[in-house]
Design a protein with these regions (language model features):
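Conserved catalytic/switch belt of AAA+ P-loop NTPases
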Residues: 91, 116-130
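Loop/turn-to-beta-strand initiation segments
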Residues: 96-101, 126-132
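Clamp-loader machinery-focused feature within the broader ASCE/P-loop NTPase space
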Residues: 1-113
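Conserved adenine-binding aromatic site and its adjacent loop/helix in ATP-hydrolyzing domains
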Residues: 88, 120, 147
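Charged, glycine-rich active-site and insertion segments that engage polyanionic ligands
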Residues: 1-24, 127-130, 135-170
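Residues immediately C-terminal
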Residues: 109, 124, 140
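Generic recognition of short, well-ordered alpha-helical segments
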Residues: 113-117, 144
């Protein structure tokens, strides 16, 4: 449910962009970072696959994402190169002139050097820029990152409720 909550928060933060009428996943000021796999290359195609995964899997998890993208061998992680892209995008003016939202799904997969690079952004975030980190293992997040975040703990949604909600969203 963490990703669903993050998307709802993003909708709220981006709602003043009345010029945008499309699907929230296609909003030009909403950016996702997620674990990538060494066995899967093409970055641009992977982002499109990620958006398709989100639309098809309301309550997708790490294993479903790994399987969806066709990974069979490597452990996924959010890479330093991804944080470098976030640094660049976050330093630019928002596309529609309002807020920018960056959602990090699977934040626990960041290696220490990746976390340290993200920490630099979190220490002095650009104006009107919001970062939402989602993790299933908060102990895997650097304490210095945690200290810069507002924490919301969510209990797992039981399978029956998850299935009902997934049916309603399609």
């Amino acid at each position: 449910g963490g990703l669903n909550l993050a998307i709802e928060i993003a909708k709220s933060l981006l709602k003043n962009d009345s010029s945008f009428q499309g699907d929230i996943y296609d909003h030009p000021d909403l950016h996702f970072s997620f674990p990538s796999f060494a066995s899967i290359k093409d970055d641009e195609n992977v982002y499109s696959e990620w958006l398709s995964f989100l639309k098809e899997n309301t309550f997708g998890d790490y294993q479903k994402w790994s399987s969806y993208i066709g990974n069979t061998v490597s452990q996924g992680s959010i890479k330093v190169s991804e944080i470098e892209k976030v640094q660049k995008k976050s330093s630019l003016k928002s596309y529609l002139g309002g807020n920018k939202v960056f959602i990090f799904w699977g934040a626990e997969t960041m290696m220490p050097q990746t976390s340290n690079k993200l920490l630099k952004i979190l220490e002095e975030p650009p104006v009107n820029t919001y970062f939402i980190l989602i993790t299933s293992n908060i102990q895997a997040i650097l304490p210095t990152i945690i200290s810069r975040c507002q924490i919301s703990n969510l209990s797992p949604i039981n399978k029956k409720v998850r299935e009902t909600l997934a049916k309603r969203s399609t």
